Amino acid sequence: MTQTSNIILIGPMGAGKSTIGRQLAAALHLPFRDSDKEIEKRTGVDIPTIFEFEGEEGFRNRESAMLEELCTEQGIVLATGGGAVMRPQNRALLRDCGLVVYLKTSVKTQLRRTARDRNRPLLQTENPRARLEELMRIRDPLYREIAELTVDTDRDSIRKVVQEISRYYRMNNKDSIPQDDSNTEPQGDG
């Protein structure tokens, strides 16, 4: 981990990066950023619209630029898109940006968590399971390559995942955050 106090959440769609990221940020009293949401704010359109008009390459260009911008901030929890690790320059950037945490989940869990979400352009296919398996085969080694910490989100509650990351972060970043533990319990146990 670098001297910055950022926490970067990586992993496949449906791993819980946004949900866990918000609760982790609240527990650590840090601002939360979601790179996909920041892209949507900046462009004024949703991710599927960007894919429709610019293709995946256009979206990945926007994503790389947004990650560069967000990594200039210090003391944030950042949820990245599932494909952010596809470009070598993004992997290098994220590794240098802070503590990289791989939120690992199974394809079965991904399917359950994303079944009704039409905001996932890569899953708009006849066989979402096959697509998720293909993405996992390609991306899992890339997530592992840059992760300092890997947490399985299949077996633990949101609360336990947040506690595990918080504990690791505090042990390795003692001077960067307040040590007041009075309000570090996340809400819900999802």
Curated annotation (Swiss-Prot):
GO MF annotations in UniProt: ATP binding; magnesium ion binding; shikimate kinase activity
Annotated positions binding ATP: 14-19, 120
BP GO annotations: amino acid biosynthetic process; aromatic amino acid family biosynthetic process; chorismate biosynthetic process
CC per GO annotation: cytosol
Cofactor detail note: Binds 1 Mg(2+) ion per subunit.
Needed co-factor(s): Mg(2+)
Pfam families reported for this sequence: SKI
Keyword Hydrolase: no
Gene3D superfamilies: P-loop containing nucleotide triphosphate hydrolases
Catalytic activity: shikimate + ATP = 3-phosphoshikimate + ADP + H(+)
Record flagged with keyword Amino-acid biosynthesis: yes
Binding-site residues, Mg(2+): 18
InterPro entries referenced in this protein's UniProt entry, alphabetically: P-loop_NTPase, Shikimate/glucono_kinase, Shikimate_kinase/TSH1, Shikimate_kinase_CS
EC supergroup of this enzyme: transferase
Compartments, record wording: Cytoplasm
Sorted UniProt keywords: Amino-acid biosynthesis, Aromatic amino acid biosynthesis, ATP-binding, Cytoplasm, Kinase, Magnesium, Metal-binding, Nucleotide-binding, Transferase
Pathway: Metabolic intermediate biosynthesis; chorismate biosynthesis; chorismate from D-erythrose 4-phosphate and phosphoenolpyruvate: step 5/7
Binding-site positions, substrate: 36, 60, 82, 139
Subunit relationships: Monomer.
Database matches in NCBIfam families: PRK05057.1
Function: Catalyzes the specific phosphorylation of the 3-hydroxyl group of shikimic acid using ATP as a cosubstrate.
HAMAP family in the record: Shikimate_kinase
Protein family: Belongs to the shikimate kinase family.
Descriptive protein name: Shikimate kinase
Species in which this protein is naturally found: Thioalkalivibrio sulfidiphilus (strain HL-EbGR7)
Taxonomic classification: Bacteria, Pseudomonadati, Pseudomonadota, Gammaproteobacteria, Chromatiales
